[in-house]
Structure formats: C-alpha cells, structure tokens
Amino acid sequence: MDRWVNSNQQAHWDKRTFYRDARDPAAEAFSVPKIDWFCAELGIDTDATVLDVGAGTGMFTYWWSQRMPEVTGLELSENMIQRSAVPDLLQVGDAYELPFPDDSFDIVFAASLLHHLERPVDALREMRRVARRGVAICEPNRNHPPMAAFGVVSSVCRGLLHYSRHSLRGLAEEAGLDVRNVRLHGYIYENRSPTASVPIAKKLEAVLPGGAYILLAAAP
C-alpha cells in the first residue's frame, strides 16, 4: 500500500486519542450544513451512494449515513477507525489507489484530507475515477486568521497554509474535475469548538462573510 502521508503524520494519527464524537451537537452543526450545500450544488437529494475518503473517525461518514442509503468511509489509520462511532461503515484503504471500480459512487467526498497529502492531485484523480455524479471537497481556509495560526503552530497541519479558494480550484481543475462552485463556510471548528459555542457560531455563519473552510463541488 502506498502511504498517503509521511511517517511523522502517520505517527500522529496512530497515537492521537481525542476526537469529537460524531453524534455531538457541535459535530452535527459542523457537518450537516456542508453536506446540505454539497447536495444542493450537485443536484443530489437522498437517494445516492457516498464514499468518504480520509474519513478519520467517521464524523462526516455518520452524518452522510443519516441522509443517504449507502455510505462507505475509507481511512488509513486503524486507530481512528477503532475510535469511530460507525466502525462498521469504515475500512482501511489508500487514497491514491481507491479499491473500487470506476463510477462506483454517486458522490465522492473528502474533508480536511488534501492538505495532509504529498500528492493531492493524484488523490483527486482517483476520486474523479470512482465518482459518477459529483466530487465534494472541504479544506481549511488559510485566509481565515485562526486557521492560519493553527497551520503555523501545528507541523502536522502546516499543509493547510497552501489552501485558498483559488488554489483548491486549481488542484481540482488539474485533476480534470469540472468545478461547479467554490465557497467559504463555517465558524465551527471540527474538534475545537466547545458545544456551548455552537449557537453563537451559527449566528456568525448567518451574517459574516468568509469562513474557516473552503467547500468545492465538482462534476467528475
């Protein structure tokens, strides 16, 4: 198996112990609006199959499964799968060589994956290969000050400093994807926003431009 990430990153994911439970209200507030937007942009409602690449502990996998009939999560770290709320939906696999035939899933999705990869365009090409109807990508926004600060202090996440709306679109187009829309979204942080802060963060999301994450919807 070709390793997605370098040895330092792999050690981090294999040893990390804290992850927010997928069913936490903050996880729902973080995940569901993004899923709703992707479905609207790709013209997909509730009857679709989904592959979540780099699923981690399955936060998005869980919320996709609340909407779609068939969801599969692919993750490199067995440690993360063991800590998942939905381990039955996850399997070990390689983002550079997805173990599925062409056109296997309606939607191929990845969140906070590409900035950890040494060859993100190769991974996007694989996602395009197995997608029938759409590819949906969520990445941290380097132009969001708290996210940029996190990228500076965290060696594992330093790759996020390369990601903006423009750069993510460029990677997707280099991989041959037909980009439909790119937007910024979110003032809730995946594993860092206290649950009590969610109501305030939702109000900020409703009125403030920008956001901590870049969302890209594309056709294969």
Residue ranges, per PLM feature:
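Class I SAM-dependent methyltransferase SAM/SAH-binding core
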Residues: 57-97
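A C-terminal cap/extension of S-adenosyl-L-methionine-dependent methyltransferases
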Residues: 180-220
